[in-house]
Swiss-Prot record:
Gene name tied to this protein: psaC
Record-level GO cellular component terms: chloroplast thylakoid membrane; photosystem I
Essential cofactor(s): [4Fe-4S] cluster
NCBIfam families tied to this protein: PS_I_psaC (TIGR03048)
Region forming the signal peptide: none
Uppermost EC category: oxidoreductase
Domain 4Fe-4S ferredoxin-type: 2-31, 39-68
Gene Ontology process terms (BP): photosynthetic electron transport in photosystem I
Membrane topology label: Peripheral membrane protein
Cellular location(s): Plastid, Chloroplast thylakoid membrane
Source organism phylogeny: Eukaryota, Viridiplantae, Streptophyta, Embryophyta, Tracheophyta
This protein's name: Photosystem I iron-sulfur center
Residues annotated to bind [4Fe-4S] cluster 1: 11, 14, 17, 58
Length: 81
């Protein structure tokens, strides 16, 4: 079951989440919106196992990367059974 991975613009480009991900869901891409000139991206969300290690590794106060587990996503959209 696939999970949603959202990267917010509070990302500082530190690569901590990319290094923490055991299934290589995340990667860094060029971005001019921060000092590091890069931001995390989640091109392989189908491989996300929902461990949330990326969230734990994020050093920003705003949790720049968030994993929404399948049941959390459907519940927030009002379509849970």
């Amino acid at each position: 079951m696939s999970h949603s991975v959202k990267i917010y613009d509070t990302c500082i480009g530190c690569t901590q989440c990319v290094r923490a991900c055991p299934t290589d869901v995340l990667e860094m891409i060029p971005w001019d919106g921060c000092k590091a000139k890069q931001i995390a991206s989640a091109p392989r969300t189908e491989d996300c196992v929902g461990c949330k290690r990326c969230e734990s590794a994020c050093p920003t106060d705003f949790l720049s990367v968030r994993v929404y587990l399948w049941h959390e996503t459907t519940r927030s959209m009002g379509i849970a059974y």
